[in-house]
Amino acid sequence: MAQQYQPGQRWISDSEAELGLGTVLAQDGRLLTVLYPATGETRQYALRNAPLTRVRFSPGDVITHFENWKMTVREVDDVDGLLVYHGLNAQNEVVTLPETQLSNFIQFRLATDRLFAGQIDQLSWFSLRYNTLEHTSRQLQSSLWGLGGVRAQPIAHQLHIAREVADRIAPRVLLADEVGLGKTIEAGLVIHRQLLSGRASRVLILVPENLQHQWLVEMRRRFNLQVALFDAERFMESDAGNPFEDTQLALVALEWLVEDEKAQDALFAAGWDLMVVDEAHHLVWHEDKASREYSLVEQLAEVIAGVLLLTATPEQLGQDSHFARLRLLDPNRFHDLKAFRAESENYRPVAQAVQELLDKGKLSAEAQETIHGFLGAEGDSLLAAVNTGDDEAKARLIRELLDRHGTGRVLFRNTRAAVQGFPERKLHQYPLPCPVEYLELPVGEHADLYPEVSFQSQPEVSEEERWWRFDPRVDWLIDTLKMLKRVKVLVICAHAETAMDLEDALRVRSGIPATVFHEGMNILERDRAAAYFADEEFGAQVLICSEIGSEGRNFQFSHHLVLFDLPSHPDLLEQRIGRLDRIGQKHTIELHVPFLETSPQARLFQWYHEALNAFLNTCPTGNALQHQFGPRLLPLLESGDDDEWQSLIDEARTERERLESELHTGRDRLLELNSGGAGEGEALVEAILEQDDQFSLPIYMETLFDAFGIDSEDHSENALILKPSEKMLDASFPLGDDEGVTITYDRNQALSREDMQFITWEHPMVQGGMDLVRSGSMGNTAVALIKNKALKPGTVLLELIYVSEVVAPRSLQLGRYLPPAALRCLLDANGNDLSSRVSFNTLNDQLESVPRASANKFIQAQRDQLTPRINAGEEKITPRHAERVAEAQRRLAADTEEELARLTALQAVNPTVRDSELVALRSQREQGLAMLEKAALRLEAIRVLVAG
């Protein structure tokens, strides 16, 4: 018979007990809407199978009104489907309490109900529940939460930025690292940590259309974030009233969005906590006019609290364009371009003084005068201490200057010069004769840069005449691969057709094991290709990628890169080299560039090498130089006088050297120091690597797999294959694939094998499995025989596991101060608590299972004796709970007071501190303290131990 639901009825979620007491809001057709006031969250369920249990108290139960007074139930009436409780309050007065007025924080003693109902679980499940609670508590308190689970090597500056930004309330910042330093990973870490902490629950990611796939791959593969990619087709085909409301994470191409007003309306109506905009430097703004893209992002930034802009470095952009990004973040602060220019000039001497302090360890009289002018009299004592060689004072002085830096809190910009760990590059050039078949082709756009595409598109080309049978680059590639033997080689070319043809050529002409990677393949096909390439023993020697197909992938286990052709823009060239040239690459990057002599390919090679120096170094000036010289460059690539060509090369080289000199002298060491974290990032790296070396996760997961009926078998070194067994307990276990998955706990293995799941405490499989344990009832009762000579046979010990927790909105992050913790009580026959003398594991080693029928018979016989002892357990544990709550309140108050004091003082000298930040922080403190006041104890599990 179907459940009858009425608005106002109280129900509890079977799968999300932590939400507290729910209230039925509405029954609409086949949907049921339930509000959970304790957390402020709403859930919708299918009416026929809602995972809900009716809250119905019985005479003798003590219940709580939402105003915190208690009553003992004597009678229960059902009035039109709503329960009304009658009973006595603490003053012995007759009172009535309708269920609509029940406290949202009431806890349920389900363990007791199951124990006396004969639902007794295995000892292994009891241990799993206890260990799950312990690990949950530990992770929620960890400073690494949201930072350690990414499929990437931990890198100091990225971790520093992620923690600094993600721990703010509604962060509004500009990430402007140089190319290759991992802005996308920084943004992903911020998104991930904000989602896990509850500071954000809905995220909008706006990117150029050509980067959509890269973001999709990065978010899914690195962070296990299920991002929904939106385009015109998906938007039109959606049955939902507002397609954007159906997803937590939306990835949208700006080019499509700016053209579709209906999609814009839906996007604004959906509501978002955080907006991330990639390639924000392409948003065009001038004082008198802004582009449609800029205006759209500006309107969104006005209604979305958190904004992350990913952009080129300020030096590349120029000051006006840099100002345009900053005004998106804070239009009140950055409203006047002239004032911004003047302010920037004022900071330059301070940055130079800091550079002097860092380089020389002391300050000249001129530098001291500059700092005095900036900090005033309060900086004099610090300066005096610095002059005596006090390193701590030096660090404090730099910190003070950082805090007051004009854009120090909103701008993060790391440079390769400031970040160590990049490999060298070595260039190998191979001029080859241009075949007559290409010389006879008609001249067309890009025809001479990619002649194989033009040749193959001719209708009369037969199988025997295919381009790879005569192109000398193919012969050269085969010879090079044979010379390198089984060394892994990445080949990148502009077009998918070229990549597929090259795979055919290698198979037909050489038998060299190769695989291909292009935009026509789905993610699973690309994963398989990447895994085949990564396999050291039986894998492909060469992976052939198209330009677009390789976006978002990391192949740094290889260090040989073949540029089979050259892209038409220096940014694309840097993207190609960046597939291997990343922090953590352990070898020199060997760049192999074949090109056809006396062709546009040869001149483009010369342009990149001699004018831009783009092969041997990153080229931060490449975009500006291409824009400046592009109108002259393109005609000269195809034809033109040699002297005119050489003149262009010389001019561009001179201009590049001038721009690079400007960049170097304009380096803001103060900003670099702030962005790098001044040592904080290194500490995070060490902590993550230390966590990686621990065995607690694999040990815990093995017990979890056993409990849920997941079979695991060795795949290879450091890798396991997981498959559902015939005895799989719960089909909702988040295995990821019904057929099975391959996992690894090893970070390095996961980096080279993207087809394997990288299992960390943050992985959805781990979190989902732990949620199933916590939200279910399995393991909250057990009966065991204890073998201990010190105990008289027949002695009954009672082990009670309580959860000390606070039910509150995740955005308050009270889990940092009062994470759900298992408080254990071990009562002997006299009511003494032995838990401090006998640990959980020590006790576990002395226990033997009891058949369920025998256990149930014993419990029923002992029910009258056990009930008062169970009730007495809460009295034993309450002081420990109260101590935890008081400490949590103290820490929360201290942390917020310290941060409020810092920000208030800072606001007086640095206008980038927003009033809204201070208001939100005060509100968060008051709400947090009020919620902690309501923290409760919940009896989570009972184990009855009989000495034998």
Swiss-Prot record:
Output one GO BP term: regulation of DNA-templated transcription
Mind telling me which SUPFAM superfamilies this protein's record contains? P-loop containing nucleoside triphosphate hydrolases (SSF52540)
Which GO terms of the molecular function aspect are on file? ATP binding; DNA binding; helicase activity; hydrolase activity, acting on acid anhydrides
Q: Which Pfam families match?
A: Helicase_C (PF00271), RapA_C (PF12137), SNF2-rel_dom (PF00176), Tudor_1_RapA (PF18339), Tudor_RapA (PF18337)
* InterPro entries associated with the record: Helicase_ATP-bd, Helicase_C-like, Helicase_RapA, P-loop_NTPase, RapA_C, SNF2-like_sf, SNF2/RAD54-like_C, SNF2_N
Enzyme Commission number(s): 3.6.4.-
In chain numbering, motif DEAH box lies across 278-281
What top-tier enzyme class does this entry carry?
Answer: hydrolase
Q: Where is the Helicase C-terminal domain?
A: 473-627
- Going by the entry's taxonomy, the superkingdom of the source organism is recorded as Bacteria
Name the UniProt key words of this record, in alphabetical order. Answer: Activator, ATP-binding, DNA-binding, Helicase, Hydrolase, Nucleotide-binding, Transcription, Transcription regulation
Annotated ATP binding lies at D177, E178, V179, G180, L181, G182, K183, T184
Q: Is Transcription regulation tagged as a keyword? A: yes
- Cite the SMART domains for this sequence: DEXDc, HELICc
List, for all copies, the residue spans of the domain called Helicase ATP-binding: 164-332
Similarity comment text for this entry: Belongs to the SNF2/RAD54 helicase family. RapA subfamily.
PANTHER family named in the record: DNA ANNEALING HELICASE AND ENDONUCLEASE ZRANB3 FAMILY MEMBER (PTHR45766), SWI_SNF-RELATED MATRIX-ASSOCIATED ACTIN-DEPENDENT REGULATOR OF CHROMATIN SUBFAMILY A-LIKE PROTEIN 1 (PTHR45766:SF6)
Q: What is known about what this protein does?
A: Transcription regulator that activates transcription by stimulating RNA polymerase (RNAP) recycling in case of stress conditions such as supercoiled DNA or high salt concentrations. Probably acts by releasing the RNAP, when it is trapped or immobilized on tightly supercoiled DNA. Does not activate transcription on linear DNA. Probably not involved in DNA repair.
Describe the protein's quaternary organization and the partners it interacts with: Interacts with the RNAP. Has a higher affinity for the core RNAP than for the holoenzyme. Its ATPase activity is stimulated by binding to RNAP.
Fetch the HAMAP family from UniProt: Helicase_RapA (MF_01821)
**Record-given protein name:** RNA polymerase-associated protein RapA
Q: What does UniProt list as this organism's lineage?
A: Bacteria, Pseudomonadati, Pseudomonadota, Gammaproteobacteria, Pseudomonadales
Q: Which gene encodes it?
A: rapA
